[in-house]
């Protein structure tokens, strides 16, 4: 290698050695953009040196024999050195922040003889920013100092002999820059330096693909803490996620940070690595939100790549509302087994579902009616004057009633099953058809209704025969109701003439009257409404005072005779039953067919009607089935399912209701028994008696609609919320039940099956009496239970005289109410626990009664005992019970009285299966007998070592033992009470009721 230099030979040899070992072969970092690299230039650098004899450029070979260029200076013998070396003009490109990397060696001044005063070990780095090359002159005052550079390690003469490398690397930053380029300058002030390499670069974040977004090359910011936000561009066949655009940040070190948002593959494409590939044939992706392509659903296909949906096969369709992942479907086949039933001008159609529903669950039915001339073979649509029950189209059930047909006319009915794709099909309609001929028509509408006479409590009406009787009119039906009630409840009167007098009306009240005619073909339509206001009390009194006294006496006598005849007649026919007999009631309660005196509302047994349907229509409102929406099944009754749903009457908001349905295949007797409950309930109107909304008897299924009670039966509700109510809340529930029973007793109605299971609770904890319609017959079996068609009802709630002599009165209901009180205060425990029915009857006859439930106030238990008096005449009336409970509610302190203060001691009821506690020798044996031996140590630790001490324990004592389970507390306390009773009975201190 040839060297040309003005430096001393020992300096040059050192430099050559350094050059041979200066190149490290370091790879360029990917995030750096090189502007200048002296090592990469093999020709002369030709930088400017001032003065010319200062810095000197030399060349050499590295270990790979590649030429490299370097600059050296070693003016250490003279002081005040000022040697400048300037690079050529460097274009900065897009950089805002420049990095300068220097690699150099520096001689230790102490290793040079005679230079201690003039030798330095540092040099200075400068830059000058300019938009263009300014030539070869160096104006020192234009340059800005970057830093003073010192060596971390310097070498000596000894290092040269040992061939040790001591190469220094320093990096400095410049910026922010505002011009197009710049110069670098190196100032030597008297050091011995070899500038091995100079590298100038800036950093940027290289282009990458992240979350399917392409982020381009991005130059870093001008500050060390800068983060440059970059918005990505989605790769091919991808799109930005909604409201989540892809973004990343380029740091000052050239690294991508903080990814935000992303791109997702479009419909028909799925992600594979950093690209989106199309779905293959037979696959699809309907939305960019889906991750992967899916196989086409049943009866669909895709014959090209990148499909966003699959096309349906021939004869198969997809409804507009069907999502793409749903299989293609087809219209259903025709309904099966179409049958009909003609009733004069009304036709009932029933059918079975189609054999093929087309693969859908939204099958409904629509009816097409055609009136036909069979002689000419032509049919025309029936027109809009035909009525359909419940409706003509959109039928969910498989039956319909078509009304208002012409008499003696020919009709064809087509029943078509449709689903969500029927309207898309171009195939021929599939339907079941039937042709019929109607019979005689019902009469037309009654007209000319007029009021003839209006009094205080009666109205006389007259009317004209229908214009088209269509047969012999056998009777007229007058429907009337108070206008304020808006037909919520109505009454009917029937007559054979074209006039009638409606009695027992309220004075000063507006009534609405409508009349319809009846023939062998059925009822015609009601006449238009006629509003009539009865006279006020004062007006009637004034009128009556003007009458002749003799006439008044005669009228009173005649009225008295009529009343007597009706009472005798009612007594005779009163032995007929509706569901269950009232014939065994005593006194005035035996006469359940009452003449209705003004101001008194009395229960009327529906069975007194020759036609039970008349009782239903008199006491229950007929509802339109289309106003009822059944939502779900909540139970099963004796006659069918019990459902919850909504009732929407015209002009009113919809309300939640419970719907009892009559099962398919019912007998006429079952139908009458089913509707008998509605006939009974329709007579009641009290906030603590379940309210009847109405009935549906003119369609299928037959329904009874009552108000919906959210919390269900009282016994199950109490068991579910064991211990969660205050005594006041429980007494409030009992007061509501008593108020409902008082109302029923005042009407002369005997419930006969009063129990917590037959009390319903609404969302406001209001209790209401229910269950009025089951048919009950007393059997002479040893278990003494009621037998119904649906099962047996236990006698635990029944009064002794009702079991033994079948005497059912309001007093027997009071006995049952006492049992309900016990159920409520014990949170739904079973009365008499596991005792057999025969044991219960025997214990009651011997005078034993149920003990007070845990934490039951003495006053409440005393009221229970009063209800359980053997002599029914000594039991309180429901009116008295309501008064007693009202006093307790007004004086809550009375409910805190300890049980021990009962005025009349009793012997708690003893189960024959209960262990004889006198046979136990220890507390441990007793606990083992009642399966509570786990608490033996608790009793021993508390000092309860004898049964006598245990018998004196209270509920607080039991809780103090650490027994936290409420069920275990109740079981132990009940056993203690029984133990206490046995001990008292043993010593002759027990007193029976």
From Swiss-Prot:
<dbReference type="InterPro" id="IPR027936">
    <property type="entry name" value="Eph_TM"/>
</dbReference>
<comment type="function">
    <text>Receptor tyrosine kinase which binds promiscuously GPI-anchored ephrin-A family ligands residing on adjacent cells, leading to contact-dependent bidirectional signaling into neighboring cells. The signaling pathway downstream of the receptor is referred to as forward signaling while the signaling pathway downstream of the ephrin ligand is referred to as reverse signaling. Among GPI-anchored ephrin-A ligands, EFNA5 is a cognate/functional ligand for EPHA7 and their interaction regulates brain development modulating cell-cell adhesion and repulsion.</text>
</comment>
<feature type="transmembrane region" description="Helical">
    <location>
        <begin position="551"/>
        <end position="571"/>
    </location>
</feature>
<dbReference type="GO" id="GO:0022407">
    <property type="term" value="P:regulation of cell-cell adhesion"/>
</dbReference>
<dbReference type="GO" id="GO:0007420">
    <property type="term" value="P:brain development"/>
</dbReference>
<dbReference type="InterPro" id="IPR001090">
    <property type="entry name" value="Ephrin_rcpt_lig-bd_dom"/>
</dbReference>
<comment type="subunit">
    <text>Heterotetramer upon binding of the ligand. The heterotetramer is composed of an ephrin dimer and a receptor dimer. Oligomerization is probably required to induce biological responses.</text>
</comment>
<dbReference type="GO" id="GO:0031952">
    <property type="term" value="P:regulation of protein autophosphorylation"/>
</dbReference>
<dbReference type="InterPro" id="IPR017441">
    <property type="entry name" value="Protein_kinase_ATP_BS"/>
</dbReference>
<keyword id="KW-0325">Glycoprotein</keyword>
<dbReference type="InterPro" id="IPR036116">
    <property type="entry name" value="FN3_sf"/>
</dbReference>
<dbReference type="InterPro" id="IPR016257">
    <property type="entry name" value="Tyr_kinase_ephrin_rcpt"/>
</dbReference>
<dbReference type="GO" id="GO:0005004">
    <property type="term" value="F:GPI-linked ephrin receptor activity"/>
</dbReference>
<feature type="glycosylation site" description="N-linked (GlcNAc...) asparagine">
    <location>
        <position position="410"/>
    </location>
</feature>
<feature type="domain" description="Eph LBD">
    <location>
        <begin position="32"/>
        <end position="210"/>
    </location>
</feature>
<feature type="binding site">
    <location>
        <begin position="634"/>
        <end position="642"/>
    </location>
    <ligand>
        <name>ATP</name>
    </ligand>
</feature>
<dbReference type="InterPro" id="IPR008979">
    <property type="entry name" value="Galactose-bd-like_sf"/>
</dbReference>
<keyword id="KW-0675">Receptor</keyword>
<protein>
    <recommendedName>
        <fullName>Ephrin type-A receptor 7</fullName>
        <ecNumber>2.7.10.1</ecNumber>
    </recommendedName>
</protein>
<dbReference type="InterPro" id="IPR001245">
    <property type="entry name" value="Ser-Thr/Tyr_kinase_cat_dom"/>
</dbReference>
<feature type="domain" description="Fibronectin type-III 1">
    <location>
        <begin position="331"/>
        <end position="441"/>
    </location>
</feature>
<feature type="binding site">
    <location>
        <position position="660"/>
    </location>
    <ligand>
        <name>ATP</name>
    </ligand>
</feature>
<keyword id="KW-0829">Tyrosine-protein kinase</keyword>
<keyword id="KW-0217">Developmental protein</keyword>
<dbReference type="GO" id="GO:0050730">
    <property type="term" value="P:regulation of peptidyl-tyrosine phosphorylation"/>
</dbReference>
<dbReference type="Pfam" id="PF00536">
    <property type="entry name" value="SAM_1"/>
</dbReference>
<feature type="modified residue" description="Phosphotyrosine; by autocatalysis">
    <location>
        <position position="609"/>
    </location>
</feature>
<feature type="active site" description="Proton acceptor">
    <location>
        <position position="753"/>
    </location>
</feature>
<keyword id="KW-0067">ATP-binding</keyword>
<feature type="topological domain" description="Cytoplasmic">
    <location>
        <begin position="572"/>
        <end position="993"/>
    </location>
</feature>
<dbReference type="GO" id="GO:0005524">
    <property type="term" value="F:ATP binding"/>
</dbReference>
<dbReference type="InterPro" id="IPR050449">
    <property type="entry name" value="Ephrin_rcpt_TKs"/>
</dbReference>
<dbReference type="InterPro" id="IPR000719">
    <property type="entry name" value="Prot_kinase_dom"/>
</dbReference>
<dbReference type="InterPro" id="IPR013783">
    <property type="entry name" value="Ig-like_fold"/>
</dbReference>
<dbReference type="InterPro" id="IPR011641">
    <property type="entry name" value="Tyr-kin_ephrin_A/B_rcpt-like"/>
</dbReference>
<dbReference type="GO" id="GO:0007411">
    <property type="term" value="P:axon guidance"/>
</dbReference>
<keyword id="KW-0812">Transmembrane</keyword>
<comment type="similarity">
    <text>Belongs to the protein kinase superfamily. Tyr protein kinase family. Ephrin receptor subfamily.</text>
</comment>
<keyword id="KW-1003">Cell membrane</keyword>
<dbReference type="GO" id="GO:0005005">
    <property type="term" value="F:transmembrane-ephrin receptor activity"/>
</dbReference>
<keyword id="KW-0597">Phosphoprotein</keyword>
<dbReference type="InterPro" id="IPR034283">
    <property type="entry name" value="EphA7_rcpt_lig-bd"/>
</dbReference>
């Amino acid at each position: 290698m040839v060297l040309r230099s003005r430096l001393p030979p020992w300096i040059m040899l050192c430099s050559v050695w350094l050059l041979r070992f200066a190149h490290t072969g370091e790879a360029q970092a990917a995030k750096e953009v090189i502007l200048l690299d002296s090592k990469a230039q093999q020709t002369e650098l030709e930088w400017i040196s001032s003065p010319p004899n200062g810095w000197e450029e030399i060349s050499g070979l590295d270990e790979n024999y590649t030429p490299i260029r370097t600059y050296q200076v070693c003016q250490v013998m003279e002081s005040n050195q000022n040697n400048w070396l300037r690079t050529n003009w460097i274009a900065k490109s897009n950089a805002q922040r420049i990095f300068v990397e220097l690699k150099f060696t520096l001689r230790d001044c102490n290793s040079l003889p005679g230079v201690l005063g003039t030798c330095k070990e540092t040099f200075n780095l400068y830059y000058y920013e300019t938009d263009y090359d300014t030539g070869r002159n160096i104006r020192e005052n234009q340059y800005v100092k970057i830093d003073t550079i010192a060596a971390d390690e310097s070498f000596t003469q000894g290092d040269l002999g040992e061939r040790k490398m001591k190469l220094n690397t320093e990096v400095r930053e410049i910026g922010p820059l505002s011009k197009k380029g710049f110069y670098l300058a190196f100032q030597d002030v008297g050091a011995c330096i070899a500038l091995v390499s100079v590298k100038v670069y800036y950093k940027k974040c290289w282009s990458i693909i992240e979350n399917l977004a392409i982020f381009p090359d991005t130059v870093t910011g001008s500050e060390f803490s800068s983060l440059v936000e970059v918005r990505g561009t989605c790769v091919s066949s991808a799109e930005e996620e909604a409201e989540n655009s892809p973004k990343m940040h380029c740091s000052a070190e050239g690294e991508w940070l903080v990814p935000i948002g992303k791109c997702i593959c479009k419909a028909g494409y799925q992600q594979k690595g950093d690209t989106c590939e199309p779905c293959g044939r037979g696959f699809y992706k309907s939305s960019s939100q889906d991750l992967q392509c899916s196989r086409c659903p049943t009866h669909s296909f895709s014959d090209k790549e990148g499909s966003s949906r699959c096309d349906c096969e021939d004869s198969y369709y997809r409804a507009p509302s069907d999502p793409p992942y749903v299989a293609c479907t087809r219209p259903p086949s025709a309904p099966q087994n179409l049958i009909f039933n003609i009733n004069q001008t009304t036709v009932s159609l029933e059918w079975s579902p189609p054999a093929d529903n087309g693969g859908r669950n939204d099958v409904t039915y629509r009816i097409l009616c055609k009136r036909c001339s069979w002689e000419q073979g032509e049919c025309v649509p029936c027109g809009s004057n035909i009525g359909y029950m419940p409706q003509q189209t959109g039928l969910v059930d498989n039956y319909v009633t078509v009304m208002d047909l012409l008499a003696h006319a020919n009709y064809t009915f087509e029943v078509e099953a449709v689903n969500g794709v029927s309207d898309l099909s171009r195939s021929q309609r599939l339907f079941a058809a039937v042709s019929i001929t109607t019979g005689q028509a019902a009469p037309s509408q009654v007209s000319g209704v007029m009021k003839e006479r209006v009094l205080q409590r009666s109205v006389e009406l007259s009317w004209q025969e229908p214009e088209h009787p269509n047969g012999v009119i056998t009777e007229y039906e007058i429907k009337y109701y108070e206008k304020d009630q808006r037909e919520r409840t109505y009454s009917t009167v029937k007559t054979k003439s074209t006039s009638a007098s409606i009695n027992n009306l309220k004075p000063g009240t507006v009534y609405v009257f409508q009349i319809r005619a009846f023939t062998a073909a059925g009822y015609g339509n009601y006449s238009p409404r006629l509003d009539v206001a009865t006279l006020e009390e004062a007006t009637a009194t004034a009128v009556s005072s003007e009458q002749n006294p003799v006439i008044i006496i005669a009228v009173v006598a005649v009225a008295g005779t009529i009343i007597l005849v009706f009472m005798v007649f009612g007594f005779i026919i009163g032995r007929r039953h509706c569901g269950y007999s009232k014939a065994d009631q005593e006194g005035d309660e035996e006469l359940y067919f009452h003449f209705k005196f003004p101001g008194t509302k009395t229960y009327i047994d529906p069975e007194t009607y020759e036609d039970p349907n008349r009782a239903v229509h008199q006491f229950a409102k007929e509802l339109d089935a289309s106003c009822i929406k059944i939502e779900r099944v909540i139970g099963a009754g004796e006659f069918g399912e019990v459902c919850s749903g909504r009732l929407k009457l015209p002009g009113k908001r919809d309300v939640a209701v419970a719907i009892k349905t009559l099962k398919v295949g019912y007998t006429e007797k079952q139908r009458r028994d089913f509707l008998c409950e509605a006939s009974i309930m329709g007579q009641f109107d009290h906030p603590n008696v379940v309210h009847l909304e109405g009935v549906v008897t003119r369609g299928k299924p037959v329904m009874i609609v009552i108000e919906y009670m959210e919390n269900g039966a009282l016994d199950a509700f109490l068991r579910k919320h064991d211990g969660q109510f205050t005594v006041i809340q429980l007494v409030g529930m009992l007061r509501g039940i008593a108020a409902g029973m008082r109302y029923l007793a005042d009407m002369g109605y005997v419930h006969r099956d009063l129990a917590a299971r037959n009390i319903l609770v609404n969302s406001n904890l209001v209790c209401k009496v229910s269950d009025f319609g089951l048919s009950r017959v007393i059997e002479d079996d040893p278990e003494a239970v009621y037998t119904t068609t649906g099962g047996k009802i236990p006698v635990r709630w029944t009064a002794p005289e009702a079991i033994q002599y079948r005497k059912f009165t309001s007093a027997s209901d009071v006995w049952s109410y006492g049992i309900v009180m016990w159920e409520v205060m014990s949170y739904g425990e079973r009365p008499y626990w596991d005792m057999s029915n025969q044991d219960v009857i025997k214990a009651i006859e011997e005078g034993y009664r149920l003990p007070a439930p845990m934490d039951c106030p003495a006053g409440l238990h005393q009221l229970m005992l009063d209800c359980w008096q053997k002599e029914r005449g000594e039991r309180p009336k429901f009116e008295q019970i309501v008064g007693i409970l009202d006093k307790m509610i007004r004086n809550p302190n009375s409910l805190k009285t300890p049980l021990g203060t009962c005025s009349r001691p009793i012997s708690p009821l003893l189960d024959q299966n209960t262990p004889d506690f006198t046979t136990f020798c220890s507390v441990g044996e007793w606990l083992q007998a009642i399966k509570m031996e786990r608490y033996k140590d608790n009793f021993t630790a508390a000092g309860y070592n004898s049964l006598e001490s245990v018998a004196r324990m209270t509920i607080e004592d039991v809780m103090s033992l650490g027994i936290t389970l409420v069920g275990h507390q109740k079981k132990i306390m009940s056993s203690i009470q029984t133990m206490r009773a046995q001990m008292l009975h043993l010593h002759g201190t027990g007193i029976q009721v």
